[in-house]
Amino acid sequence: SNLDAKLRVSMRVRISQLHKELGSTMIYVTHDQVEAMTMGDRICVLREGKIMQVDTPLNLYNHPANKFVAGFIGSPTMNFLNGVIEEKDGKLLMKVKGTELEFPESMREKIKGHTGKEVSFGIRPEHISLGKEGEQNALKGNILVKEQMGNEEIVYF
């Protein structure tokens, strides 16, 4: 963790090569989720000494077991919105800050049991895009900072 970014990347590559060459089981302990995601076949996410989830990197990312895992895995981290689930005209909606966000039909079975309840909804940064006011599923907000990364731009709001 004390290595500069470029050296950290080369060390990850070298350790991964060694793992492949040796063909043995290795346990690598890190607090850096990028290292875990890029080097691990299976990852054990711990919180205060308790196992939260053990899975492949992509399953941790796409199907986190709980809010802690969802917020820990991924960089930039997952965004969380709090709101109330409602059913209106046959559609499932979440009211967030005066805006109704419509859920796709594919999520109906997972969400239906939460109608009328306050929930915390997580959304990955790559599923958010800047849009125009009034567009469907648009939240109004102010951009605080933009970080230009070359191939992508990270927007904080």
Give the positions of each predicted feature.
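C-terminal boundary and immediately downstream tail of ABC-type ATPase nucleotide-binding domains
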Residues: 63-88
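Alpha-helix boundary/capping detector
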Residues: 29, 41, 86-87, 95
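A generic "cationic amphipathic patch" detector
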Residues: 28, 49, 56, 62, ...
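ABC ATPase nucleotide-binding domains
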Residues: 1-68, 72
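Non-catalytic connector elements of ABC transporters
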Residues: 78-80, 87-157
